[in-house]
């Protein structure tokens, strides 16, 4: 699956910003057909970072949300700044 089709948009909520600052996690809405491996590959390729783990859930609205934890040597704040979240 094309990395640019896997990630639909970042989530910008109070909880998502808190996760960026406290747990080094990014939150994205992703394609519902994307697997955790697809999401990991897409984030690593697009943002040039290494991913530690990916957790996913289907929201009540029917969207797939992915919580992506980056390895400690990479900063979620820097990626968020590149995305324009800060």
UniProtKB/Swiss-Prot annotation:
Superkingdom assignment: Archaea
Cellular component terms (Gene Ontology): ribonucleoprotein complex; ribosome
Keywords from the UniProt entry: Ribonucleoprotein, Ribosomal protein, RNA-binding, rRNA-binding
GO BP field: translation
Residue runs in coiled coils: none
GO molecular function, one term: structural constituent of ribosome
Entries under InterPro entries matching the protein: Nucleotide-bd_a/b_plait_sf, Ribosomal_uL23, Ribosomal_uL23-like, Ribosomal_uL23/eL15/eS24_sf, Ribosomal_uL23_CS
Keyword Ribonucleoprotein: yes
Gene3D superfamilies (alphabetical): 3.30.70.330
Keyword set includes Chaperone: no
Role: Binds to 23S rRNA. One of the proteins that surrounds the polypeptide exit tunnel on the outside of the ribosome.
Family note: Belongs to the universal ribosomal protein uL23 family.
Subunit structure: Part of the 50S ribosomal subunit. Contacts protein L29.
Protein name according to UniProt: Large ribosomal subunit protein uL23
The species this protein was found in: Pyrococcus furiosus (strain ATCC 43587 / DSM 3638 / JCM 8422 / Vc1)
Gene giving rise to this polypeptide: rpl23
